Amino acid sequence: MGPGGWRKPPLAGRNPLPTADVVIEVGDRVVLVRRKYPPPGWAIPGGFVEVGETVETAAVREALEETGLRVTLTALLGVYSDPARDPRHYTISTVYVGRASGAPLGGDDAAEARLFGEDDLPSPLAFDHAKIMSDYFRYKRTGKRPL
């Protein structure tokens, strides 16, 4: 029991960590980064939200750090919260769509950054990013965002 009879929740100290990702459109292709650190694979640029930072600011910052691209956010794609989506931590990710121009360059914790189309996505995609990319391409075709 805490002060005043307050009961500490069983998962206190293990709350979800907020992350922000952005599907970066460059023309008719999207930017993915090859992760430098485990878990391996290709991923949507993104990362953890820092203290005092908005989720939108984190998405733009992470995109710049990992790809060298200055991104303008254009849409909210969705929020992804499956507790098993990241093997390292329980994360809740807010995923945006954004636009940029130029050639991506891997930086920070991205070993490489490249442009891909729907028919030539690399494998494996890390985390739940295959689902997110599927949701993104469906959104582009239909205008419907995932729930």
Each language-model region and where it sits:
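NUDIX/MutT-family hydrolases
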Residues: 97, 105-138
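Acidic, metal-coordinating catalytic segment for phosphate/diphosphate chemistry
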Residues: 1-21
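Conserved Nudix-box catalytic region and its N-terminal flanking loop in Nudix hydrolases
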Residues: 26-65
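Residue-level preference for beta-strand/loop junctions
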Residues: 16, 40, 88-92
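A short coil-to-beta-strand element that immediately follows conserved catalytic motifs
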Residues: 69-78
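Active-site-adjacent beta-strand/loop module that shapes the phosphate/pyrophosphate-binding cleft
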Residues: 80-104, 135-136, 140
